[in-house]
Amino acid sequence: MDAKQTRQGVLLALAAYFIWGIAPAYFKLIYYVPADEILTHRVIWSFFFMVVLMSICRQWSYLKTLIQTPQKIFMLAVSAVLIGGNWLLFIWAVNNHHMLEASLGYFINPLVNIVLGMIFLGERFRRMQWLAVILAICGVLVQLWTFGSLPIIALGLAFSFAFYGLVRKKIAVEAQTGMLIETMWLLPVAAIYLFAIADSSTSHMGQNPMTLNLLLIAAGIVTTVPLLCFTAAATRLRLSTLGFFQYIGPTLMFLLAVTFYGEKPGADKMVTFAFIWVALAIFVMDAIYTQRRTSK
């Protein structure tokens, strides 16, 4: 990868994780809408937003090329399921007062990326990376052993998003085209659920206030912009390097949860957070040291 691609990847990764970090504030505005309904709106409006974006950027030629590779289309169905599950779990967590555990999941995620990069992409661990991963595992095990609880939400978010990033990197599909196909795979299920199954006070857009409908439509922008930045960054950076930036999003989530939404971390969560934070500190220092050494 050349220096220009790396710089682009860094900027795209920073943008993606900053937007994700403050995204819970958006979902809190529509907390009274069921999580499954919000998910359907994310899918539907993301699809139409991508159609408009593809038209403006005149990138339909990429789609024509992609259609000629059925294997990649199938793999995008896999990535669509992974990201759809991640979206649903995240929305539910934020709107059911589990924002802290959601942030924990994205603190764990960079370390999961390191493991997946080693297993599936042949990326080698350095000693300090091994130490960081072991500390993260210890944090989860201590919570399980001492407090009898397991951060299911955190682990679900961490692994679903890590595997999503891995699949997208293996496919190496242009970001916008890949996002369009992913939402296209999810669109029929989302449309059937919203228009034929969902029956809540907010499921009928014709009866909703205009402000609510605008917020629901905005789910397409809130969803696609950071995800496009992420997938574009994933094709320009090593997966382990991409993990370096992922502390930005969960840090913002943690601060939002504690400062604005009154969530208080219990002893079990703080033990796990402590292990993860130490692991991330080691990971970051190792990355900085390695970068300085290789640049000399």
Task: Indicate where each model-derived feature is located.
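Membrane-interface interhelical linkers
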Residues: M1-A15, F48-L76, R127, M179, ...
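Glycine-/small-residue-enriched transmembrane alpha-helix faces in small-molecule transporters
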Residues: M1-E37, L141-K170, I192, L256, ...
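C-terminal-most transmembrane helix of multi-pass membrane proteins
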Residues: D2, Y247-K296
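Hydrophobic alpha-helical transmembrane segments of multi-pass membrane transport proteins
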Residues: F18-I22, Y26, A77-V94, G156-F163, ...
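Hydrophobic/aromatic residues within transmembrane alpha-helices
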Residues: I30, I38, A93-V94, I119-L121, ...
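Alpha-helical transmembrane segments of compact multi-pass small-molecule transporters, enriched
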Residues: W45-F49, G105-I119, V189, F245-F260, ...
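Hydrophobic transmembrane alpha-helices of multi-pass small-molecule transport proteins
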Residues: M128-L144, L157, D268-A287
